[in-house]
């Protein structure tokens, strides 16, 4: 294909069969895909104005295509006790607003484990907004799947339609106490053999048309599927004359970049392009070797005396050496 990788980010309308066929054949011909799909649509304007909204299924027409290729996008929202903060008005306090920080359970914060895939290795936490869960499905010979990111074990699922309200911050911590050993998958890597979604759906005339060059499978393809298009969306701030984008990974509560969404995205693209060198460079870790505090305290006096006395002894020794050399020279004369 003309392009080595393709990013499908946040579609808000339904894909036609023609578009789906083109994407399917792009994969069959050696292309690689990064999918960032929102299974549910959340009206943020209603949430800001009315403090609540309803998240409903967003029909993109891609659910069956992705299911066939190994990823089921679930029509739910993940609420996680390990989440980003949000600043809300907690009620009047005199004549001023009482702005306080709360846990925003609709925004999971995920840190990959020590045995993480190279895409996630040595990265700081990443941040999601209204993310859905994904299930790896339809395993076939020659294709493997791997969960790249998952929620914490203290996470729960709300199935669509989901009432999204600011009052969710009042949920007690006990609400998230589960017996789960693992979290819910949020990003999945699929690589290896893929079979065309349209192998048994196209009519024989079109499938066998040499000008169309239909391919039924590929032995080595790569796909990354994530159920949150906001993962790569820059936040914005108002400026004179309009709005300006903030860096990807910006946290409004702390007013700085603390999430590694950008590095994760770059690593994902590099992996799809089979550029391991770039991933290694971005994921390079620096090992800090802390000093032994106990040993420092025990030898503190010795080191102080050495630091002060060494220069004095060095000067005295140099002076004695010069004096001896001068005396020797005059004695010989």
State where each predicted segment sits.
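Juxtamembrane amphipathic/hinge helix adjacent to a transmembrane helix
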Residues: 266-299
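C-terminal signal-anchor/stop-transfer transmembrane helix together with its immediate cytosolic
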Residues: 290-333
């Amino acid at each position: 294909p003309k392009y080595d990788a393709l990013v499908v980010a946040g579609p808000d309308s339904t894909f036609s069969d023609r578009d789906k066929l083109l994407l399917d054949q792009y994969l069959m011909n050696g292309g690689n895909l990064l999918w960032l799909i929102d299974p549910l649509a959340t009206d943020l304007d209603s949430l800001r104005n009315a403090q609540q909204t309803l998240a409903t299924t967003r029909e993109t027409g891609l659910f069956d295509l992705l299911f066939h290729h190994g990823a089921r996008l679930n029509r739910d929202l993940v609420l996680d006790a390990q989440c980003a903060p949000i600043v809300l008005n907690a009620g009047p306090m005199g004549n001023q607003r009482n702005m306080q920080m709360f846990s925003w359970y609709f925004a999971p914060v995920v840190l990959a484990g020590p045995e993480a895939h190279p895409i996630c290795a040595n990265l700081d936490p990443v941040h999601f907004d209204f993310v859905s869960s994904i299930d790896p499905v339809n395993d076939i010979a020659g294709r493997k799947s791997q969960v790249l990111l998952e929620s914490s074990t203290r996470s729960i699922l709300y199935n669509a339609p989901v009432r999204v309200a600011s009052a969710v911050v009042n949920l007690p911590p006990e609400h998230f106490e589960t017996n789960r050993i693992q979290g819910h998958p949020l990003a999945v890597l699929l690589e290896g053999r893929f079979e065309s979604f349209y192998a048994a759906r196209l009519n024989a005339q079109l499938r066998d048309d040499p000008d169309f060059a239909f391919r039924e499978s590929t032995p080595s393809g790569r796909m990354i599927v994530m159920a949150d298009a906001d993962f790569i969306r820059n936040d914005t701030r108002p400026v004179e004359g309009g709005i300006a984008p903030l860096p990807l990974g910006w946290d409004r509560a702390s007013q700085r970049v603390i999430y590694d969404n950008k590095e994760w995205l770059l690593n994902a693209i590099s992996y799809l392009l089979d550029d391991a060198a770039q991933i290694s460079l971005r994921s390079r870790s620096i090992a800090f070797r802390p000093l032994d505090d106990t040993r420092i305290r025990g030898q503190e006096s010795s080191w102080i005396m050495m630091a002060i006395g060494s220069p004095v002894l060095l000067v005295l020794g140099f002076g004695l050496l010069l004096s001896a050399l001068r005396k020797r020279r005059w004695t010989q004369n």
